[in-house]
């Protein structure tokens, strides 16, 4: 059992680690080199790939994942900053695509009222599931996300991503692929407040 909690107290094997990289540490723990393998979204079920193409049939899409699952840590970036970023992306001829569940009507309505042409594909599908999010993400040019579960679903599509971090550990939780750009408020502004990250900080990376 591998865990770094309380200085590796619960790990079944006591090993001294010199890195904060969990993949490197796990390789030492298992005494075996761990290889990074990118997921191929084309191996998803064909019905989900077809559904994604039906929902997002064109190109120049940019995705946004804005809601956090756990409320105990303030990981959310202001919805108004996401709205501003989505509207600025229209200047680059990008169509904003929001990954928001159907039960978040108040958020969806707020975005619809302020972002012309914004799409909410999950609300139009009868087969919403994590795999559909990955299939939809494969149709995107870029994606912007906070640290949440959808971030990992998007990252499986292996597309350019910008991920925003505040109180959580970007080195631990950020997707491990070559297309991810990280904006960590702790490293940029020396604060855990994710709100310190500006719209232009993100826009300049798109």
Model-inferred region functions:
Residues 1-206:
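Catalytic machinery of carbohydrate-active enzymes
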């Amino acid at each position: 059992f591998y865990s770094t909690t309380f200085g590796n107290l619960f790990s079944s094997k006591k090993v001294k680690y010199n890195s904060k990289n969990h993949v490197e540490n796990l390789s030492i723990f298992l005494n075996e080199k761990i290889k990074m393998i990118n997921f191929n979204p084309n191996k998803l079920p064909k019905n989900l790939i077809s559904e994604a193409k039906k929902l997002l049939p064109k190109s120049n899409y940019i995705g946004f994942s804005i809601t956090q699952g756990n409320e105990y840590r303030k990981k959310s970036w202001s919805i108004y900053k996401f709205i501003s970023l989505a509207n600025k992306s229209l200047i680059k001829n990008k169509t904003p695509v929001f990954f928001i569940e159907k039960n978040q009507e108040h958020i969806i309505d707020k975005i619809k009222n302020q972002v012309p042409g914004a799409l909410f594909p999950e609300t139009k599908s009868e087969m919403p599931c994590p795999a559909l999010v990955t299939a939809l993400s494969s149709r995107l040019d870029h994606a912007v996300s906070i640290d949440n579960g959808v971030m990992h679903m998007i990252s499986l599509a292996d597309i350019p991503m910008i991920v925003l971090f505040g109180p959580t550990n970007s080195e631990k939780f950020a997707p491990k692929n070559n297309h991810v750009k990280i904006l960590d408020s702790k490293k940029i502004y020396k604060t855990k407040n994710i709100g310190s990250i500006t719209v232009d900080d993100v826009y300049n990376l798109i």
